[in-house]
Amino acid sequence: MQLADLTQRLAALGAKPQHIGRITRAWLQGKPLDTGTKHQKTENFLPLSVRQELPAIAAELDALVRLRSEHPGADGSARLLVELADKQMVESVLLPRDGLCISSQVGCAVGCVFCMTGKSGLLRQLSSAEMVAQVALGRRFRPVKKVVFMGMGEPAHNLDNVLEAIDLLGTEGGIGHKNLVFSTVGDPRVFERLPQQRVRPALALSLHTTDAELRQRLLPKAPRIDPEQLMELGEAYARSIDYPIQYQWTLLKGINDSQQEMDNILRLFKGKFAVLNLIPYNSLDADNYQRPDGERIVQMVRYLHSRGVLTKVRNSAGQDIDGGCGQLRARAVDLVNTSRLRLSRH
């Protein structure tokens, strides 16, 4: 289901824009679709034809996503394993301070070497309704005032659906435009489309290195955009929305934590409307990467910050509960496959 399908269905039942808006807002808040207001009951507002169909519509919306399991973290986050109607699984993460990280694809085609999600490749796109449904689900647990498209998938590879979801969340969803964050490895279509939108979200760009050849190895299927060019594109968007770009940098010991990288960061970030997020690597099973030790990370932050680069350390939420993107899903899929194998042997 796409969000447009819901609107068209309600309109066909005789719902006016104000009716559709109220029903949509109730869904986005994780409330029953027939929720009224303090001053007006549903039966005095919605047409009878719409009210009669609401139970069936609610059942379809509830079927979009289902909580498979919840995994609270020591940092106040909670990782949600979410099952879709076709039994595929994605991850959402409730973040401290009323944030929610959602997925835009099942799997991912970019194939970042340090990311579990990319190891499965792209399995399918999420519809705009499936993305918004993750927000509705999250709001059943706690308030959600910020939504970041940083879960499984590359939003630029599902651009129409992601932009449709962002538009609804930034209007009927009641989320401030700067509290909607579009995260991408960098794609020319993103820089063309985002400035044209009614809701223009904040932007996070996966940089990870200042070395173009190294970036190609780390992000093998990302568009071939030189880091310097990527930052120029980001800068233009930052100035247009008057909000800084977040540049993501997954810290890999001995790979992108050198003094040369830091000096290049100083050069590229000079005068930029930007924030650098250093993300210590979250180890996967049987991989070849490690995070730098804590002392080295502190040195990097102090060096960059003291020279004018606003630098923050962002640990993956819920590191104690398979915190790296895609790890929870990978373990669940492995358990399902193992169970099927055992059954086939009996």
From Swiss-Prot:
Its main location: cytoplasm. Keywords: 4Fe-4S, Cytoplasm, Disulfide bond, Iron, Iron-sulfur, Metal-binding, Methyltransferase, S-adenosyl-L-methionine, Transferase. Disulfide bonds join 101-325. GO terms for biological process: rRNA base methylation; tRNA methylation. PANTHER family: 23S RRNA METHYLTRANSFERASE, RADICAL SAM CORE DOMAIN-CONTAINING PROTEIN. Belongs to the radical SAM superfamily. RlmN family. This is Probable RNA methyltransferase Pmen_2155. The lineage of its organism: Bacteria, Pseudomonadati, Pseudomonadota, Gammaproteobacteria, Pseudomonadales.
